[in-house]
């Protein structure tokens, strides 16, 4: 089955210093978190285009967009979409449960690279610097009740064949 979705970027605030990312905390860019009114307007525009699946995307900054913010967003847009997916900062089981109860169906997390030795070179500071916490995110999401969990690697950071292989191993473990 092929499913079409539309991303809705909620915030570009991020506490991470990923060397490859435009949301890097050190980048001097205008930062924004959508208000509930802006979320409502954007979600309506997406739904009016015929999309029934939405992906909520944000930089990793619980201070600016945390679990309570995401809960409010999900509850606000739930009547407009058959499926609500999230691609935000990794969370605890308890926080993920809040989002499942609010109506989120799917969580996606990219490990970026499965090479634990090179991982710190790409993620020197911030929440994402914790390799193990990120690696175990799909386990926590599933434990919290997400019906769908997606994983991936950002091919090109390290040897793409190795990352593809370890993504497949990770998937096999999760199944």
Model-predicted regions and their roles:
Residues 27-173:
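Conserved Radical SAM active-site core
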Residues 5-38:
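Canonical Radical SAM [4Fe-4S] cluster-binding loop centered on the CxxxCxxC motif
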Residues 1, 172-175:
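Short, intrinsically disordered, charge-balanced linker/junction segments flanking boundaries
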């Amino acid at each position: 089955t092929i499913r079409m979705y539309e991303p809705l970027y909620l915030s570009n605030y991020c506490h991470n210093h990923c060397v490859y990312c435009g949301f890097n905390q050190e980048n001097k860019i205008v930062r924004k978190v959508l208000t509930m009114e802006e979320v409502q307007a954007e979600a309506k525009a997406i739904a009016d285009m015929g999309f029934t699946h939405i992906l909520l995307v944000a930089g990793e900054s619980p201070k600016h967009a945390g679990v309570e913010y995401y809960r409010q967003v999900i509850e606000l847009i739930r009547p407009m979409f058959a499926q609500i997916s999230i691609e935000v900062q990794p969370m605890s089981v308890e926080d993920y449960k809040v989002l499942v109860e609010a109506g989120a169906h799917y969580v996606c997390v990219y490990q970026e690279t499965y090479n634990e030795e090179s991982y710190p070179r790409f993620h020197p500071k911030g929440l994402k610097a914790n390799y193990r916490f990120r690696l175990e995110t799909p386990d926590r999401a599933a434990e919290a009740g997400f019906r769908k969990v997606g994983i991936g690697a950002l091919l090109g950071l390290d040897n793409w064949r190795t990352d593809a292989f370890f993504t497949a191993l990770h998937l096999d473990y999760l199944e």
